[in-house]
């Protein structure tokens, strides 16, 4: 039966399994990877709902900036294995730092060097 579930449903089942014991914190590793935008948005809404309804702290590791901005109260931006920036999504978006701006604008060749 699990093989007949859609990717989005498998993610939802994984979330249900993760919260069944009412943890105080859940670590999500690329929770929207491989999902179409509509399903990814529903997973992000579910994560936000769990944060609000159950007071669960969520640590989300993602390369998907839309998802990061959708679910985050705080963002830590890592560069070369270190926290390069930490703040709110708005503070990240408004940052004038060239490395961050290049990343947000998709000019990844700067941060890959």
Range-by-range predicted roles:
Residues 1-5:
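Conserved ABC ATPase signature
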